[in-house]
A protein has these predicted regions:
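Tandem CBS (Bateman) regulatory domains
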Residues: 11-28, 67-96, 102-111, 126-127, ...
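A glycine-centered beta-loop-beta connector
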Residues: 24, 45-48, 53-69, 110, ...
Length: 155
């Protein structure tokens, strides 16, 4: 599904600006497997200062996502982060964004779905991840294109 490339929003005192997901997403994606423990993934997320990891399924079911919220819910429910695997807690029914979507479309998808991260796919390949933080960073008062976080890293 492609976004409307002509979508506009009124930002910065009425000045029109339009940005695409590709301009705000991080191309440095933390990738983990479904067999990782929750503790291992939490450690990787902490080291890289990210709130989500793309879960690549070796059986080819498409990328899923595990977030800090998923880990907190599991631990809060009394589950052992050293014994619980990502496969038991990841989101498989993922809404994917296109790099051509406007940030407005991505933000609307996040609001509708109640989540804070979108995996960005281009022709079926993961090309990035977009977080609420990325969207907010892009919607600055001056409308500047945002630099990527310096601590983002590939896992």
């Amino acid at each position: 599904m492609r976004g409307d490339e002509g979508a506009r929003s009124h930002l910065s005192g009425g000045r029109e600006a339009s940005m695409q997901v590709r301009e705000g997403m991080s191309e440095m994606v933390l990738t983990v497997g479904p067999g990782h423990t929750l503790r291992a993934v939490a450690g990787l997320m902490s080291e890289r200062a990210v709130g989500a990891a793309v879960v690549m399924d070796p059986e080819g079911h498409g990328p899923g996502i595990i977030t800090e919220r998923d880990i907190l819910i599991a631990i809060g429910a009394g589950q052992d982060p050293d014994a619980e695997s990502v496969a038991e807690h990841l989101t498989r029914d993922v809404v994917y964004a296109s790099p051509d979507w406007s940030l407005e479309e991505a933000a609307a998808a996040m609001v509708r779905g109640g989540f804070r991260h979108l995996i960005v796919l281009d022709h079926g390949e993961t090309v990035g991840i977009l977080s609420v933080r990325d969207v907010v960073r892009c919607w600055t008062e001056d409308g500047a294109i945002c630099p990527l976080p310096s601590r983002a890293a590939v896992g």
